[in-house]
Swiss-Prot record:
Gene3D superfamilies linked to this entry: P-loop containing nucleotide triphosphate hydrolases
Role played: Phosphorylation of dTMP to form dTDP in both de novo and salvage pathways of dTTP synthesis.
Protein name: Thymidylate kinase
HAMAP family attached to this UniProt entry: Thymidylate_kinase
Reaction equations catalysed: dTMP + ATP = dTDP + ADP
InterPro entries the UniProt entry points to: P-loop_NTPase (IPR027417), Thymidylate_kin-like_dom (IPR039430), Thymidylate_kin_CS (IPR018095), Thymidylate_kinase (IPR018094)
Pfam families, alphabetized: Thymidylate_kin (PF02223)
Signal peptide: none
GO biological process: dTDP biosynthetic process; dTTP biosynthetic process; dUDP biosynthetic process
Species whose genome carries this gene: Shewanella sp. (strain ANA-3)
Residues that hold ATP according to the record: G13, L14, E15, G16, A17, G18, K19, S20
Keyword match Transferase: yes
Family from the record: Belongs to the thymidylate kinase family.
CDD domains, sorted: TMPK
Amino acid sequence: MTQASAKFIVVEGLEGAGKSSAIALIRDFIEKHTGLAPVCTREPGGTPLAERIRDLVKIADPSDPLCDESECLLIYAARAQLVANVIKPALAEGKWVLGDRHNLSSLAYQGGGRGLMPLVEAVSNATLKGFKPDLTLYLDLDPKLGLLRAAKRGELDRIEQQAIDFFERARATYLKLASEDERIVVIDASQTMAEVHKDILAVLQAMAW
């Protein structure tokens, strides 16, 4: 495998869309086809500093509520660390990278959900400078169903506790952005897990390996 062949693949989706099982499937597929396990990341998070930022974003503090703009900027601070210190170095070494969320999450959640698209686009351009995944698989699911699934996992975090209209706006933004970028593939996550995995594998098998 050459450096040029290394790819950055991201799995996106609303809460409860099945990202974890999809990531496990893709990780195994990449390892089978390249002989090496991919570098797996999550956002926010993925470096010591970014993980501390993740806690600030995910855990509610009633004594000092996080405002929408701070949430956006913190997430981009974490992302900048991850891209600079993990993702780009791994790709430069010829390693595949598999991400649990990336910039599309901010465009959907903070841009669409929070109504901060001008800020999101400005900070994205300033921090990422056009850096994008080679492929993003967006697991599309009705937010009501997704939140029901998420609730079964246990206590919801600060983001998961947002009102349903927040997630509806985020979903609409995901779908709009997917319609404008051929590198974003929409997967129907309302199907059975076997059907979802079949669709994901079809996308992966169509890639050049």
